Design a protein with these regions (language model features):
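Residue "hotspots" at secondary-structure boundaries inside conserved domains
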Residues: 72-74, 80, 105, 135-137, ...
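Structural signature of FAD isoalloxazine-binding scaffolds in flavoprotein oxidoreductases
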Residues: 100-121, 139, 274-277
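Catalytic-pocket segment enriched in acidic/His residues
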Residues: 13, 49-54, 61-63, 68-69, ...
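A generic local secondary-structure boundary/capping motif
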Residues: 4, 71-73, 100-103, 128-137, ...
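N-terminal non-catalytic cap/leader segment that marks the start of a structured domain
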Residues: 1-106, 110
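Non-heme Fe(II) oxygenase catalytic core, chiefly the N-lobe of the double-stranded beta-helix
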Residues: 121-164, 169-175
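Short acidic-glycine loop/turn motifs at beta-strand connectors
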Residues: 8-10, 18-24, 147-149, 203, ...
Length: 277
């Protein structure tokens, strides 16, 4: 099942179900579920509830997707996005070549940081350039995991049931800000730096866990990143297990699992994003 947040014709934002082919939506309010945000709804959208919703929408007219404006599935996350740094070996190599000081890659443990998101950018939306602060604007295509229930002290190998679903996230990064401050929070948290979506696909739509998925990004049609999530150094099971030790991960938590090689700073010479491109 696919979940979105959409702006209805009357201007109200409502979490909704997106059809498999992406052409229709059913606002949850039409189905008797009055949740202000998808984050609020997620803890209650259990497999049993979703099964009932699937039966219900088969007999209810939908809105054509053209009649609504899709937002990011979780426009304003309740907490910062949890991110993994340097989680693909090829990206580790390119990052260290760009700046060994800022991206030292000799580590045996996962690198975690957080990303402030005041308002996530919808699919096809605009990234703010912040030209007064940023001259080296970069992109990072990532698989993001959305938790469906609170996770605390979850054993390794038992994290699957905590995953609500997956979405796509662009961890936009100001490389000059990032390297100047010797840490990543500020350079990744500027307004408009988190395109995400268009939808969350529930975990039960994938045959394997963790899923092995192609992950690609393009800039103006040019393929830049082309990898597979099976190449992650620390997989989703490891990450949820480790982060939940002594720390409660709330339902609705978003975990961005790292980007593969092919980012702008890794090219020779580096090729960063510019306003209008």
């Amino acid at each position: 099942m696919r979940f979105v947040t959409c702006r209805l014709p009357d201007g109200v934002e409502d979490p909704a179900i997106l059809s498999q082919d992406g052409t229709q939506v059913w606002p949850l309010s039409w189905l008797g579920l009055s949740y202000e945000t998808l984050s609020d709804a997620i803890p209650f959208l259990t497999p049993q509830v979703r099964f009932g919703l699937q039966l219900a929408i088969s007999g209810i007219p939908a809105l054509p997707v053209e009649a609504v404006t899709l937002q990011s599935p979780i426009p304003s996350p309740a907490q910062d996005v949890v991110c993994l740094g340097i989680n693909y070996m090829a990206h580790s190599d390119e990052a260290e070549k760009y700046s060994a000081d800022a991206f030292a890659t000799k580590h045996q443990d996962a690198i975690y940081f957080s990303k402030r998101v005041s308002r996530a950018v919808p699919d096809g939306g605009f990234i703010e350039a912040h030209t007064d602060l940023v001259q080296k604007l970069d992109y990072e295509c990532e698989l993001a995991v959305v938790l469906g229930k609170d996770a605390k002290d979850v054993p390794a190998g038992q994290t699957k049931d905590y995953v609500f679903g997956y979405t796509i996230l662009n961890d936009v990064s100001a490389r000059d800000v990032q390297t100047a401050h010797k840490q990543w929070y500020f350079g990744k948290s500027l307004d408009g730096f988190t395109p995400m979506g268009p939808c969350i696909v529930t975990a039960d739509e994938f045959d394997t866990y963790p899923p092995a998925l192609p992950i690609r990004s393009r800039v103006n049609g040019e393929l830049r990143q082309d990898s597979n999530t099976k190449l992650q150094i620390f997989d989703i099971d490891h990450v949820i297990h480790e982060l939940s030790q002594g720390m409660t991960l709330k339902a609705g938590t978003i975990i961005a699992t790292g980007t593969p090689a092919g980012v702008g700073m890794g090219m020779d010479p580096p090729q960063f994003l510019h306003p209008g491109c």
